[in-house]
Design a protein with these regions (language model features):
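Long, C-terminal-biased catalytic regions of enzyme "large/alpha" subunits
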Residues: 1-483
């Protein structure tokens, strides 16, 4: 690391000839994790339209002191933008919030500006407010054959909007101010998870016009139905207490949403940058954009008549924790980050799982059951050296392995990341390694010692055995794949 290099240079200048550096391992309970700062924080920065315009023109941007508002430093906006994007690409921080756009879509601008969000950045509203979250697992509304149960999804959105509205009265907040303002604005946090899993199960690429259109349609249905339900509740119980002074702005925002759901590229009210509209032609499931348009038409009509019970109704949270409990393959709006996951168990050990929608996706892409099983084994591996052509049982017997050692190896392979981690003195026993395999103490205690290589297996043979046992961890290169 760069800081270590600088330390060495400084020590050398001071005349030090020997420097001792502390080393760490990667165990999740080790000291190494304690040295990594920022583990319990999410870092986001806000950029305005003015900043983005200066990036385009390669103009100067002033950094201001928070204490007195005076200029601290002036630099090129484009250079700062490059640093921000490189940092976000390499470590996912900082997150970006587009301040001008956020406040142009603010439903209650007469009160306060939206200054910040919650840590995960899905909830954008005024200071000292909060919302309760609820997420729907989208794959539960799939009918399995690239069709979506719109009626059931709309019903679930209505039901959960009502449930979250009730929860405003029951929620416990960390301060009096947050409790009061959350009661006044009654913001809700309905969202969804597993859009990546849903698209994959249908064989639709996540990064495609079709995938984006399906996602946009489902999102528009959820938010439109939720606002329409909020207006229905307002008819019975009244609008939220701050609605009257914000009604004109809120209806403007709802109308802009409606226009986007209807697919218009222009005609928006008080927006500097128009949204990307819903492109109906890209959506292969024709009832989705139709339902989205109707949902927002209903939301605007009912809201114009009765107002809204809630200042906001939906968010899309990362669902990193609840998504696992909900049996989701992917969290929030994200794609799947890997075909295979190793889940570490708190009691020790691991288990390996493949994304459970992969077989369904292959079926929808017209692969037969035998092809699907072959592809699954290629990805996950067999968890055994049986039928392996390179590091086989017979080859190991020729090296001195008996049934006892082969059984020990087999019992350890199922959860192994790499077969080399199984071939060690802790699995096979120190006596066997020394007396039968003739491995020295120095070699056994060397962390980099490769027993399979010592036994005479080539790199190609070891790699082939690894794929056979542990899998390739990816679909790339799998048998039977079509172009």
């Amino acid at each position: 690391p760069e800081n270590y290099i600088q330390r060495v240079i400084q020590f050398a200048k001071q005349g030090f000839k020997e420097i001792e550096f502390k080393t760490y391992d990667t165990d999740w309970d080790s000291e190494a994790y304690l040295t990594v700062s920022g583990q319990n924080s999410n870092n986001s920065i806000r950029v305005t339209n003015e900043f983005l315009e200066k990036v385009e023109k390669n103009e100067d941007w002033n950094l201001l002191r928070r204490t007195d508002g005076k200029v601290f430093k002036t630099l090129k906006a484009k250079d700062l933008w490059s640093k921000i994007t490189e940092a976000a690409w390499s470590c996912a921080d900082p997150g970006l919030q587009y301040d001008s756009t956020i406040n142009e879509w603010h439903t209650c601008p007469k009160e306060e500006k939206i200054n910040a969000s919650n840590p995960c950045s899905e909830y954008m509203f005024i200071d000292d407010t909060a919302c309760n979250l609820a997420s729907l697992n989208l794959i539960k509304f799939s009918l399995g054959d690239k069709s979506f149960n719109v009626d059931a999804f709309e019903y679930a959105c209505r039901l959960w909007t009502l449930t979250l509205e009730i929860s405003v009265m029951m929620a416990q907040f960390p301060s009096k101010e947050i409790a009061q303002k959350s009661f006044d604005y009654r913001t809700l946090g309905l969202g969804y998870a597993n859009i990546g899993g849903l698209l994959m199960s249908w064989g639709v690429p996540y990064d495609s016009n079709e995938g984006r259109s399906i996602c946009a349609s489902i999102t528009a249905i959820m938010t439109g139905i939720s606002y329409a339900t909020s207006a229905e509740i307002a008819k019975e119980l009244g609008a939220f207490s701050k609605y009257k002074i914000n009604s004109k702005d809120m209806l403007r925002v709802i109308k802009n949403h409606k226009r986007a759901a209807e697919g218009f590229e222009d005609g928006y009210d008080s927006l500097t940058i128009n949204p990307v509209p819903l492109i109906k032609e890209d959506c292969s499931i024709t009832e989705l954009p139709k339902a989205a348009s109707l949902a927002w038409k209903k939301a605007y009509e009912l809201g114009s008549k009765y107002g809204f019970r809630n200042a906001q109704t939906t968010v899309i949270a990362p669902t990193g924790t609840i998504g696992l409990v909900m049996d989701c393959d992917t969290t929030g709006i994200e794609p799947d980050f890997a075909m295979v996951k190793f889940k570490k168990l708190a009691g020790g050990g691991y288990f390996k799982i493949i994304n459970q929608v992969v077989p369904q996706a292959l079926k929808n892409l017209d692969y037969d059951i035998n092809q699907i099983n072959d592809i699954k084994q290629y990805v996950l591996g067999s968890g055994s050296l049986k039928n392996c052509q390179s590091v086989s049982h017979s080859a190991l017997k020729d090296k001195g392995f008996e049934k006892e050692q082969l059984d020990l190896i087999e019992n350890s392979l199922e959860s192994a990341f790499d077969i080399k981690f199984v071939f060690n003195q802790f699995t096979l026993g120190e006596d066997f390694c020394k007396n039968i395999l003739k491995i020295s103490d120095t070699q056994l205690n060397d962390f980099s010692f490769d027993m399979l290589n010592f036994l005479g297996f080539t790199k190609e043979e070891i790699d082939a055995a690894n794929i056979h046992v542990c899998g390739s961890m990816t679909l790339e290169g799998a048998p039977h794949l079509k172009d």
